[in-house]
Amino acid sequence: FCSAGIMLPNGASGCPLHNLIPEWNDMVYRGQWQEAYERLSLTNPFPEFTGRVCPAPCEGSCTVGLIGEPVTISSIEYEIIEHAFQNGWVKPAKAPATGKRVAVVGSGPAGLATAHYLTSVGHAVTVFERSDRPGGLLMYGIPNMKLDKDIIQRRLDILEEAGVTFICNTEIGKDIAAQDSDDTYDTDVLCGGATHARGINVEGNDAKGVHMAMEFMTANTQNIL
């Protein structure tokens, strides 16, 4: 795989984000940690999340695995972003103001990524979240043993420093009329998550003690925070 040459068939299909994995792997090998972080950031705004919770399909696609154990790509990604934080390379994404105002509905992974990229080109971004704190699935759907809440807050602080405004306990269409949002902002970006469980059509699925995972995780996390 070489991003500057001819792509081999399925050469980058192992990563849904199309991370430039061979490139930053090589940079880490050469001790070029800051360059590796900059390369990783081209395709992934939040490596500290994916480095901890991504199921790493890239490792399943790693050709080294044909002759032995695959490269531990997820661990390398984790080390790159933590090196970046420790050395002060992770900075708020700022740009000259465009005068455009954007409302982002939902503060899960999609909403946060949208806020990051829009702020990085100079738009004023307000993120609306119906829960009591931002983060969505990251905050309420993933336990601390996989993704500590301090890691999420660290990124939220950076986004706020970049100029992103978070408004929680607010549901568009209920607490604020959708028309009011349209009148106040130049555009709206809908980033709502899939919060309603589908359930399973089996006998006993409604028995006492059977809980949908997201409902259980959300309630459990709210009790802890």
Residue ranges of each PLM-predicted region?
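Ferredoxin-type iron-sulfur electron-transfer modules and their immediate structural context
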Residues: F1-R101, K149, L190-N220, L225
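Residues forming the flavin
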Residues: E77-L225
